[in-house]
């Protein structure tokens, strides 16, 4: 029987980040246990055309705010990921219920700015996944 000192339950952002931090500190006696067949947890991006993988559509979280999420902003930068400001000018369309028609409303700007990752938030998961030893990750 194989024994391990550290078990990380879940391969979402928190689980992969925990494994990444262990790797950064030279700690290798760990496993990551994920019930699903894929990593990422609530973060998932759909890439409709593989030829344009940089244009993923986020199905979970879409934005981050490095202006107050300092650790996440630093992680994105340290992983060499490209980010861009969320488009905020013009009107927006809001659908409050499937029983009511969508309504056009004046847009607004976030302070601090909302940022997105090139390729969707899945790019963050993919970058962390590449830095975690494959043999330590066990998916369902």
Residue map of PLM features:
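FAD-dinucleotide binding site
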Residues: 1-140
């Amino acid at each position: 029987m194989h024994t391990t000192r550290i078990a990380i339950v879940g391969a979402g952002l928190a689980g992969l980040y925990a494994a990444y931090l262990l790797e950064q500190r030279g700690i290798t006696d760990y496993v990551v246990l994920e019930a699903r067949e894929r990593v990422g947890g609530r973060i998932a991006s759909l890439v409709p055309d593989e030829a344009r993988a940089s244009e993923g559509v986020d199905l979970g979280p879409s934005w981050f705010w490095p202006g107050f999420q300092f650790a996440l902003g630093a992680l994105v930068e340290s992983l060499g990921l490209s980010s861009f400001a969320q488009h905020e000018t013009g009107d927006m369309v809001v659908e409050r219920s499937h029983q009511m028609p969508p309504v056009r409303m004046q847009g607004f700007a976030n302070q601090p700015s909302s940022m997105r990752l090139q390729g969707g938030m899945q790019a963050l998961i993919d970058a962390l996944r590449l830095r975690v030893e494959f043999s330590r990750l066990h998916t369902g």
